[in-house]
Amino acid sequence: MEFIPAQTYYNRRYQPRPWTQRPTIQVIRPKPRRRRPAGQLAQLISAVSRLALRTVPQKPRRTRKIKKQKQVKQEQQSTTNQKKKAPKQKQTQKKKRPGRRERMCMKIENDCIFEVRHEGKVTGYACLVGDKVMKPAHVKGTIDNADLAKLAFKRSSKYDLECAQIPVHMKSDASKFTHEKPEGYYNWHHGAVQYSGGRFTIPTGAGKPGDSGRPIFDNKGRVVAIVLGGANEGTRTALSVVTWNKDIVTKITPEGSVEWSLALPVMCLLANTTFPCSQPPCAPCCYEKKPEETLRMLEDNVMQPGYYQLLDSALACSQRRQKRNARENFNVYKVTRPYLAHCPDCGEGHSCHSPIALERIRSEATDGTLKIQVSLQIGIKTDDSHDWTKLRYMDSHTPVDADRSGLFVRTSAPCTITGTMGHFILARCPKGETLTVGFVDSRRISHTCMHPFRHEPPLIGREKFHSRPQHGKELPCSTYVHTTAATAEEIEVHMPPDTPDYTLMTQQAGNVKITVDGQTVRYKCKCDGSNEGLITADKVINNCKVDQCHTAVTNHKKWQYNSPLTPRNSEQGDRKGKIHIPFPLVNTTCRVPKARNPTVTYGKNRVTLLLHPDHPTLLSYRAMGRIPDYHEEWITNKKEISITVPAEGLEVTWGNNDPYKYWPQLSTNGTAHGHPHEIILYYYELYPTTTIAVLAAASIVITSLVGLSLGMCICARRRCITPYELTPGATIPFLLGVLCCARTAKAASYYEAATYLWNEQQPLFWLQLLIPLSAAIVVCNCLKLLPCCCKTLTFLAVMSIGARTVTAYEHATVIPNTVGVPCKTLVSRPGYSPMVLEMELQSVTLEPALSLDYITCEYKTITPSPYVKCCGTAECKAKNLPDYNCKVFTGVYPFMWGGAYCFCDAENTQLSEAHVEKSESCKTEFASAYRAHTASVSAKLRVFYQGNNITVSAYANGDHAVTVEDAKFVIGPLSSAWSPFDNKIVVYKGEVYNMDYPPFGAGRPGQFGDIQSRTPDSKDVYANTQLILQRPAAGAIHVPYSQAPSGFKYWLKEKGASLQHTAPFGCQIATNPVRAVNCAVGNIPVSIDIPDAAFTRVTDAPSITDMSCEVASCTHSSDFGGAAVIKYTASKKGKCAVHSVTNAVTIREPNVDVKGTAQLQIAFSTALASAEFKVQICSTLVHCSATCHPPKDHIVNYPSPHTTLGVQDISTTAMSWVQKITGGVGLVVAIAALILIIVLCVSFSRH
């Protein structure tokens, strides 16, 4: 059905033109006349009578005008009524005459959609699309078709959809679907649907609950989406739909979407009769008319899911229509009342029954706000009306009003009250050891209640500040929302016990008079037999005394908080109600300050930070290698800290600032191309240990060789002069004496010979001194002429660009697992021009498989009001509650009166109960305990292939293939199966901790896991908090107990630094899902499948000749700090791949354009001080030689584009000096050896 979308005006934005009265002709009907006799005679008689009785016309009387005005007014009133009825008529008209789009959809829907019914009501729709029957999963009920109702549906919670195969005989009724969704207008049951920006929207009011499952059609009648719900956004409503994208099902869910299945009425119970909770048809359904019966009905349905609907209906039963405002939130308090409860310290060091008793102090909010529950009620007056400026408290058994301005809270100093409603106060307080709440009553008397409570505002972030900054950083935190609307949090209430009041009794002679003062009074007297009852009028008891009677006021028209500080109503037992409470705890963001940036000074492999904290600020740092060596320190004053920067890098976090990262460079003060002392200084600053070891070894070797030479010379000398010394009167020849430094004529000392030469022959004296100098000159000249006896030794092990040459269609290479470092590989095939592939890791994610064991959080201890059994013994009953404890205590209260208000002669007992539940904060403040299993690794890789930069994502498992243009890449698996996560991890608010937590069901008191639950919302709770009930003190109603502190709170204080700060290899830890990002560990193999069409034949590529390379400048260990100029001659214009055949050199350019005779400049990076490398352009190689100098910057904030795995190489200059020294020492040894050999040969020949 093709049609052109027409402009329609249903659901238009503009209101219809206002109705105006049109000018009409007033028709006045004549009065009814009497019937006249027929015939001409009768007509003649009437005509004569008219002529005879004719009078002069007169002006109309005023009465006629008044009647006319009245008539006009009546017409105006009828017109006004028509105006009021006009919109209703128009709406009914609109429903009767649907627009073109609606008529179009109705025709298609007649065949392809079916109603889903539940208990006779339509809750949604099912649609026949393609070969499937589709129904929203949230729609409850059965399809209104016998064949479709029998089908077995498959449920998908991800898409909120249920699907089944269409019966064969119904396939012709199904609609087609399409994934083509150009922006524009589409059709559905209620008119037009606009599709723009990937969202479907309709005018607000066009859709409603019950429309879930309706299809959206295009102009050809094809289904483009199925409606699930909607989100009201003002004038427009965004639809939540299931749609298709290239045959893939997707779900579009705008924020705030509500499911549009028809809500089913929730049923409540009264006297074995069910009724809708929102519409109670019973007699006691209005609290204002029958309060006691209404509360009884609510207590009977307290566990029903529609309890709060019933409560709202019972409170809003008045026929008067009320506006919805903040007063409605206080409406529930009309069924409750304040109360008196026991306070341990009423301000004067003694306990009392206080009207402002403290029930509970909550401090879960991480922004430091306290939520305090007290026994009085704020914002409600005694007449149950709402007034922000008032509060009501219990004075004896009567509520009394007071001004809210007299309310105060303090710890070590006055607190700031930020919100109040009902029993609850929000306050921001300074740290302290106690908390006091008080107010001034209507008689100007101050009432206070003090509790021991250690309050220390929690730390948000990494700086201990005192006030919110104007500018800073937003961090996640939790706070109590300042809203009085109904929330998910609730408290239990019950009927209050009878309140004793002995002032109602007066002694009159021998009788007791009970004055009720309009109240219901329960009395019991022990005189002349048992005399007890319930009265509402004054009563006189004869022959009795006041001491023999007990009176108590009974009020069952209002509930009271189920407090452990007040007794339970013995008649009601466990009956109770519940009401919502304000100020829920929610997650939000808090602005925190950012510390001043430190003054950074770079040194050789060190960074010095000058810190200026405005308040105590945390400084932490870690190495980004295998051993993180994490340190942290609180800085309170100006301080200078020097930190060593390892080769793998350093991460420093200062306050709430983002982490600073530093990497060292191979900088030094010496040079590898200077004199020996400069060379030694160069290598000493780079590798001090290695340099010292090499110098020590060389010194030992040289000293040994020199010593050996001297030893051989001494041996030769001894061999030469010994025969002459043994012959009497022998004279040593002159030449031998000169060579062996021996006396020729007589055995004189060197001093005597020198004296003799100085006195007799001074020329010979000077010649004797010149002999060693000439020998040194000869040795130096020999060293100069000594040819190079050894080649340059390099000790560099650099892995930067793995250039592997292959001759196959398939190519494999290995790239380092370092993000941001480009890696190249050269692919060579016979007959084809070489191809260069450049790959760069942009991110590597390691995601473990997790299984949730449980969540743990703070617990709260529930202590219901104690049950006091007067004149008898109570019994405990078993209850399936977490950490439930129940004990019965005897001999607690006196037989007469006492704190339990008993009036009997037998023993009284108290039944105390307590159990543990998850705190209200568990929905936002909890830690999740996971088991971590095998991790999957995924990589985001940038590939330069065929002149295009393409980014792909793939699993690094060695199996998952991704396509880049026409090539297939298989990445992984990693060379190192390493993970920063242990087998057990804990996740708390975006932070991950390795922790060996206790298993489910084995928690220990006061430690992590003392309370456990499967999810934050689940009802199954395990607890072990060492809860022990204790004997109550006589004279006061209370439930004392002993309990271990919260293990969750203790863990929060002692948990230490998270993996975000302590993980090795520079891992960045993230959550949702839990993963480790960019861990620089190991290597990643890459297998590439390249088709033949991607290669260029040699005949088609340019031929390069006459190539020469000249390095203009070179700074080693820097980011492409070298520049080389290559001159060439190309046979034709084209594009050639550029690659360094030497692994130790990285070239930035993957390919260049060549033409004719020209030159090109390339940038390269190397860690060599003397770089000898070959550059391949197309198929031609050229040799380049570079003399590189160290970088000037000691520290940089980016990783090096190459990775060194050993010591630096030895420069050509250094090798030249090594050759000279080695040659010189070797020459001396050789000469000495030659002399010794000659001497030995001559000596042996003589003998």
From Swiss-Prot:
The record marks 186, 219 as: Involved in dimerization of the capsid protein. One of its GO terms (cellular component) is host cell nucleus. The chain crosses the membrane at residues 692-712, 720-740, 763-783, 1224-1244. The record marks 260-261, 324-325, 747-748, 808-809 as: Cleavage. Residues 83-113 are annotated as: Binding to the viral RNA. Residues 54-103 are annotated as: Disordered. Residues 720-740 are annotated as: Transient transmembrane before p62-6K protein processing. PROSITE patterns: ALPHAVIRUS_CP (PS51690). A motif (Nuclear localization signal) lies at residues 60-98. Belongs to the Old World alphaviruses that usually cause fever, maculopapular rash, arthralgia and myalgia. This is Structural polyprotein.
